[in-house]
């Protein structure tokens, strides 16, 4: 894209007159580095083993997911079934919490040498969302409501989520999102702006299309942040101009699947606020590099 066309695109996507306020969740020093499912490349995902490891590396928080059990408990879990990550089989919603707690969430995890080093580990257990907030009171939590809106679990999960967050007085350190637009709408209606929310895939797609067409000034999102991959179906989503446009709208830009220190630094320089990685060790390397860079600037 040439300089003239870039300037014209930004002009056409100019800042609207009325903007949403940026929630307190994003008030900390940027960038935030979050461990994806606790850092799933190096520890069994969504377990205390993973979250403790991310804390040890000094990351700011976690990106995680929740699903509802048979007895209506919110657990920290990604898949609709337990097969991929545990020694169990079947749907999460067909298990009670007590039954899920008996499963080995480190059963299928392998290290770089192909060894199952965390099978049977006491800290390789499924956690509830309540336990996660209790165990890590100083960490930011970016949580994705996974149950589909049309299911019974999906219908009641947003209210369950809200009640747990309120119980822990965690309104300022939790970001709630979902790939499903309906779930985001439900949670926003319940929380009434108290808690930061992310964009659904539909909301992100709408924003990207309007930006590309130069109709960005017609975009009035409810979401506080976009969380995206670097590209989607061949369409790049991390251009400097797109990130600038998001910041102009007070939509906090965030990217996931970032497992390169160089890419983390590139995104930071473009104005990205939140970076989600599978590798907490790389997150720590980046934070150290950034600290050195900033100290040199201020000499």
Q: For each predicted feature, which ranges?
A:
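Metal-dependent phosphodiesterase/phospholipase catalytic core, i.e.
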Residues: 2-17, 78-190, 194, 221-249
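N-terminal amphipathic alpha-helix/helix-capping segment at the start of soluble metabolic enzymes
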Residues: 6-35
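Hydrophobic faces of well-ordered beta-strands that scaffold small-molecule active sites
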Residues: 33-35, 62-64, 141-143, 174-176, ...
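Glycine-rich beta-to-alpha transition loops that act as phosphate-gripper elements at the mouths
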Residues: 37-38, 45-47, 178, 201-203, ...
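Catalytic domains of carbohydrate-active enzymes, especially glycoside hydrolases
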Residues: 53-67
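Catalytic cores of alpha/beta
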Residues: 185-187, 261-272
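Glycine-rich phosphate-binding active-site loops on the catalytic face of alpha/beta enzymes
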Residues: 273-286
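Conserved small/polar residues in nucleotide/adenosyl-binding loops
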Residues: 297-299
